[in-house]
Amino acid sequence: STGDLLRDAVAKSTELGLRAKAAMDSGKLVDDATVLGMIRERLRLPDASRGFILDGFPRNIAQAEALQKLLGELRTPLESVVLLNVDLGILFKRLTGRRICQDCGKVFNVHTAPPPEGKHRLIQRPDDKEEVIGKRLEVYEAQTKPLIKYYEAAGLLRIVDADADVDTVFKSIEHAVFKHEIKHEIKH
């Protein structure tokens, strides 16, 4: 995810990581140029030549346009964009139930995939709390949802019904990416 790229760059104190840290420490969002710089660096690594997945980026039309420009510079075509289409009630339950082990970093869900008793020290991420989720959904509606039409017009959008269990959703994503045949109505 782009969040992982940010955290890694900050931990390694790269030039871009230091810029990101300065923004985060002052309570600001990391600017698009810094995030795109991190994506550029990551996509230049040899393993990315076999393909890549961007999770959580782009989040708005301006970022999508900048990403398209970057991919053009790298001569790497964008082949598909997957929308995980999930009922808001299910989404809310998944997010509020998500917990991370403080020791190993493994992700659990207290509702759907709880950890073995007493084996993990779990924490809830601040952005998985109810009040923050509401704000994140407002931002999604205002900024991210317009990307649906943007990528649909480009013929790149693949919609996956993500209400099912993890294994079923994973298989649907594989099918959408490799077969380009899954289409559903958007739920929100």
Where are these regions (language model features)?
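ATP-dependent small-molecule kinase phosphotransfer cores
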Residues: 1-76, 87-93, 100-103, 132
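Residues within well-ordered alpha-helical secondary structure of globular protein domains
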Residues: 41, 97, 172-175
